[in-house]
Every structure is written in C-alpha cells, then in structure tokens.
Amino acid sequence: MSELIQNVKASFEQVLGYAPSHIIQAPGRVNLIGEHTDYNDGFVLPCAINYQTVVAAAKREDNIVRVVSVDYGNAVDEFDITQAITFQQDKMWANYIRGVVKCLLARGYQFTGADISVSGNVPQGAGLSSSAALEVVIGQTFKVLFNLEISQAEIALNGQQAENEFVGCNCGIMDQMISAEGRENHAMLLDCRSLETEAVSMPEDMAVVIINSNKKRGLVDSEYNTRRQQCEEAARIFGVKALRDVTIEQFNEKVAELDEMVAKRARHVITENDRTVEAAQALRAHDMKRMGELMAESHASMRDDFEITVKEIDTLVEIVKEVIGDQGGVRMTGGGFGGCIVALVPPALVDDVKAEVEAKYQAATGLKESIYVCQAQNGAGLVEVL
C-alpha cells in the first residue's frame, strides 16, 4: 500500500498545488463461499484482501469537490455539492464518486467541499470489487474529514445505493459491506437479509490465493439474469419470499413438481446456504479439512447444478486441489463463466501451488493465469493524518 500512498500524495500536490491532510483506504474482497446466495437473501462468507483503493484528501471551505484520478492519468473531475450532481458519460470513474457524495447528501449528512486524489491496485475486471472499494473509500473519506456520525454499515449501504441508482449497475450488499467492515485475519459471515455480520477468525497466516483464469467472460449478464429468474420462480413455487426460506427437506419433498432446470438451480442455492453457515463454524474452529470439503462441494454444486463454471476454471481448481489435499480449500469464486478461483492455502504450500499452476494451466488451456497471494485484511479506515 505504501506505493499507492506515495502516488496519491504526489498527484495531490502536483495537480492541486498543496499537501493533503489525510490518507484513507478501503480494500477489495474475495468471497470464500456462498455464491449466488446474496440475491436469494442468503449467507456469504467474504474476506477483505490487501489490495486497496487509497485516497489523499483535504477539506475545503467552499462547496466544490475536486477529484484527481491517478489511474486515469491524473484526470480531474470537479463538481459543486450545492448544484445538481449529474452523471458524466465521458468519465465513468467519476460517477462512482459523484454517486457516493450525492447519496450522502440525500441521507441528510452535512459537509463542505473536499480535494481528493485516488488510486487503487485492486485488479479491475477480476471480480474483486474495485468499484465497491472506491465507493467505500469515498464514504470513509467524508466520514473522516467531517466527523460524520455514520456507521460502517451505512457507508456500505450508501455505496451500494450509489452503484444501483446513480451508476446504474445492479449489485448486492456483500462487496461494500466487507470493504467497510472487514477485520484482519477474519472472514465475515453476512446475512444478506438482515445485514447482520459476524467476524469469523481464520487460521493465522493462512494465505488467501486468488487465481484469475483470464478467460474472457461472455454471456455473464444474460446468464446471471436467467439464474436470478429461475431462483425467483422456485421461491414462488415454494410460496416463500426467497430460497433462503426453503430447507433441503422441503425441497426434496417437492422436487418432483419442479421443472428440472429450476430444481437444479434451487438445489444449489439451498445447499450453498447450509454450506456457508457450516463453513463459518469450520473456519472458526480452524478445521481446514472440513472447510476444504465444503468448498469442494460448493464448486461441484456450481458446476453441476448452477452450471456457471467453465473448463478453464475447473482445470485450475483441480490443479490446486492436487497440491493442497485436505490442508485447505479451493473453488470458483464470483459470478461465473470465467473469472477467478479462490484457495485457502497453508503458507508452506503457496510456492508449490504457484509452481504447479504455472506448469500446468497454460499447457492445458492456452491461457496465462494471474496469481494474487493475499491475506485477510482490515476494512476501510484512516491510514494516517499528515
């Protein structure tokens, strides 16, 4: 993170002409288990990772917000918080920031303008929530600069609202919540219905290894929407608000009445919810053998029932599983049809995992992977006062 801090400080001074007063960060995240459960009111188990979005900031006495984006060649966006805050077609990055500020104002928070320089190293397009980290770090920045009475959960909800309503992208609450509330060496069990969170301790030093298949994700939006509709149809047939409310026993009693495809989709969600709650218990007990079994079952369910994995992802999972055996776990993570796998790997096996993947994945698929070795990190907060 030190390089990011240097970059935002330098660009702040270079473009805005004076030194910032505060450094703030918010992390990206990876979901350990609980896939496609969020929009079914279910459970997820993500952790924050040591890839962050970092802001250098200072407050202004007037109502102008100026933002410098280091990652877009020091591009600048400027707006007045007393005027209508509008969507920028030609500066997509700026809309996340505008949206967060607009939503904070709509929630009744009072503040003046600010100068902000922002940069991140959360890999974009890998499904590690670079956009949520940006939304959360901006909310955190206004909290810090103006001593706003806003909880971490509300910073997360405000970010989600900005993404849904201002940017116009549908997302659940998981990404913002873990970025805002993560804890070092812990995962977070999140109930997507009540928004209750619970910190779940992880074995000390356990590496969180994320491997991007670099498979271009086609069809992901249309397939995602289809899965969502199938889950809603299943919930309707069971007469419940969401599949969260169906037990596996109830499912088995009624499975014959369901369309075969709808049944497969529903079975994934119902069993995945149970697995996620049990995974939190296994992780807390540092029972990596059981955690590994649950992650393997999750992957098989995504592959066979939810049908969202692809050959490249299955290949990566098999390569990693051979190395870690029952000392850790591995599965696809994210929406599917490409993207990443996540593995919980004992530190002593990290180099072996990397070596095996580098030796076998490209040979099998023709694609070159990207490997990120992470640790579970703290969520958003103040890094330093300058």
Swiss-Prot record:
**Record carries keyword Kinase:** yes
Q: Name the domain of life.
A: Bacteria
Entry keywords, A to Z: ATP-binding, Carbohydrate metabolism, Cytoplasm, Galactose metabolism, Kinase, Magnesium, Metal-binding, Nucleotide-binding, Transferase
SUPFAM superfamilies per the UniProt record, alphabetical: GHMP Kinase, C-terminal domain, Ribosomal protein S5 domain 2-like
Q: Where is this site: Transition state stabilizer?
A: R29
Q: Which InterPro entries match?
A: Galactokinase, Galactokinase_bac, Galactokinase_CS, GalKase_N, GHMP_kinase_C_dom, GHMP_kinase_C_sf, GHMP_kinase_N_dom, GHMP_knse_ATP-bd_CS
Write out the residues that bind substrate: E35, H36, T37, D38, Y224
Active-site residues? D175
Q: Name one GO cellular component term.
A: cytosol
Return the broad EC class: transferase
Pfam families noted in UniProt: GalKase_gal_bdg, GHMP_kinases_C, GHMP_kinases_N
List locations, semicolon-separated: Cytoplasm
Spell out the reaction equation it catalyses: alpha-D-galactose + ATP = alpha-D-galactose 1-phosphate + ADP + H(+)
Chief location category:
cytoplasm
Q: In which pathway does it act?
A: Carbohydrate metabolism; galactose metabolism
Q: Where are the transmembrane segments?
A: none
GO molecular function, one example?
Answer: ATP binding
Q: What's one GO BP annotation on this UniProt entry?
A: galactose metabolic process
Enzyme Commission identifier(s):
2.7.1.6
Main role? Catalyzes the transfer of the gamma-phosphate of ATP to D-galactose to form alpha-D-galactose-1-phosphate (Gal-1-P).
Matching entries from NCBIfam families are given as:
gal_kin, PRK05101.1, PRK05322.1
Q: Which family does it belong to?
A: Belongs to the GHMP kinase family. GalK subfamily.
**What protein does this entry describe?**
Galactokinase
Q: What is the lineage of its organism?
A: Bacteria, Pseudomonadati, Pseudomonadota, Gammaproteobacteria, Vibrionales
